Amino acid sequence: MQIEKTAELNLLWGTLILEELSRLGVQHICMAPGSRSTPLTLAAAKQSKLKQHLHFDERGLGFMALGLAKASQAPVAVVTTSGTAVANLYPAVIEAWLTHVPLIVLSGDRPPELIDCGANQAIIQPAIFAQYAKQINLSTPDLAIRPEALLTLLDEAISNQSQPLHINCMYREPLYPSTMSANFTQYLSTLGNWQHTNHAYNQYGKPNLSSLPSSDAMARFVHGKGVIIAGTLTPDCDPQALVALSQKLGWPLLTDAQSQLRQHPGVIGNIDQLLHQPKAKALLMQAERVLVIGGRLLSKRLIDYLAQNKWKSYWQVLPRQMRLDPSHSAKQIWHASVTNITSLSWPRSSEANWALQLTQQNDEMERLFEQQIDNAEFGEAMVVRAIAKSQTKQQQLFIGNSLPVRLYDMFAPITTEQGATFTNRGASGIDGLLASACGVAMHQGRATTLIIGDISQLHDLNSLAIASHCSSPLVIVILNNDGGNIFNLLPVPDEKLRSDYYRLAHGFEFGYGAAMFGIPYNRVEELESFEESYQDAIHYEGASVIEVIVPQQQASDQIARIASWIKQS
């Protein structure tokens, strides 16, 4: 092939790739600038079916794509140039793999003759993500390779894919076509009708992998005292159906922070703190059967409860085959959606309403939180509860890792409304949280609140640049307790060790950071000013930062006081 046609063929392959991705359900493409990915960048610039998102930092870019994929429940493409640019996506790819989010990484790469020979910005990119992504390594574009071979390779890899895919795209120079004089009509003629439709070249049916219990199995299972536990569930999976199932069986529904039901009045949302209480735990230990729907529970006390109880029958329901049982206690695992499992003809339990007292205890716990948190000193738990109380079904809440998500799990209020709730609890890292929340906010433009700790925000400071481009309300609430104060809750043997090696007090505040990116900022130290700032921010068409300044020990001391009261009650 003539050398001057190389750039045009590179662009053609990039165009074919992105066109097929759009036909396979990709709605968003996230791109970082770089030269070796130029064929993909130029193709994206001409592609009207994909919404473009650009950012200079590949680590934040990957997490933004993760948030977009979580919110859209569809695959999202990420384009980077060669070298360490690809490696910067690794944290987001790991999180996506562990939580079954379909990211598609398209990495520009040097051709084979420039690998492992000292060429600039050239590393060995195939399989860079190891077991955390399915791998496709494309050769350099070549007219000897029929275009349908490229399309069918993509179709097989992406159709029904629920985890990351890495497509490594090798390109020879020149990368920038000076003209578009090449005629590829003959080359594309083998595609037939594909050029005149909007369908993928190969269309795969949905695999039916569901496994459901028989009527006899369900009748045996519900014979006795049981509980239902709702783990991590996505907002679109009809979690309300679990409330109806709980009522039908007459078993209590214990809900995780990530279940979309933590604040529902018809469930036992305060389960983490109830397991502190001797009489509540004694009642719960009477349960003989458990139905766990979803995995990745947040509460260690709830995980320990599952491990410690002597279950006669332990069923787990997951959307696909995977291991999400760290106590290794489940005996029967069903592969089904929430809709499929709840729409079965379940019989009423022989021990229906055996634990009605739990509802009373759950309500008593809420009254305790109102007294000990809402009417006490200003602090992190008070802010988390205030945010949760104000949420509507049209809003979204992204809860950061470390202390914020635990405060929500422990103390979230009982409310009549709850918006969609998002977390990054696969690897549970504190990186990329702001970028992920930006992605969630950008998909449909719903008002979104992020609750994030100060160390997490320092990790992702660059992503304020992404936030500055948000056109819908994005409220970034930074709980600044001057360091990693979750370590106050852990048994570090010496206070100086805790301070010097774990907590790492920094003394930073975020006003200048917000100003650098042109984002409105408020600093608050009491509830009235927080609520006023929050209401302004949730109605502002763009990102806002509210920094909550609290003493280092405030949250941990309050948690300890409440735990002591509960244990004695």
Curated annotation (Swiss-Prot):
The gene is menD. Homodimer. This is 2-succinyl-5-enolpyruvyl-6-hydroxy-3-cyclohexene-1-carboxylate synthase. Binds 1 thiamine pyrophosphate per subunit. The keyword Metal-binding applies. GO terms for molecular function: 2-succinyl-5-enolpyruvyl-6-hydroxy-3-cyclohexene-1-carboxylic-acid synthase activity; magnesium ion binding; manganese ion binding; thiamine pyrophosphate binding. Keywords: Magnesium, Manganese, Menaquinone biosynthesis, Metal-binding, Thiamine pyrophosphate, Transferase. Its cofactor is Mg(2+); Mn(2+); thiamine diphosphate. Belongs to the TPP enzyme family. MenD subfamily. InterPro entries: MenaQ_synth_MenD (IPR004433), MenD_middle (IPR032264), THDP-binding (IPR029061), Thiamin_PyroP_enz_TPP-bd_dom (IPR012001), TPP_enzyme_TPP-bd (IPR011766). Catalyzes the thiamine diphosphate-dependent decarboxylation of 2-oxoglutarate and the subsequent addition of the resulting succinic semialdehyde-thiamine pyrophosphate anion to isochorismate to yield 2-succinyl-5-enolpyruvyl-6-hydroxy-3-cyclohexene-1-carboxylate (SEPHCHC). Pfam families: TPP_enzyme_C (PF02775), TPP_enzyme_M_2 (PF16582), TPP_enzyme_N (PF02776). Pathway: Quinol/quinone metabolism; 1,4-dihydroxy-2-naphthoate biosynthesis; 1,4-dihydroxy-2-naphthoate from chorismate: step 2/7; Quinol/quinone metabolism; menaquinone biosynthesis. It comes from Shewanella woodyi (strain ATCC 51908 / MS32). One of its GO terms (biological process) is menaquinone biosynthetic process. Its EC number is 2.2.1.9. It comes from the Bacteria. It catalyses: isochorismate + 2-oxoglutarate + H(+) = 5-enolpyruvoyl-6-hydroxy-2-succinyl-cyclohex-3-ene-1-carboxylate + CO2.
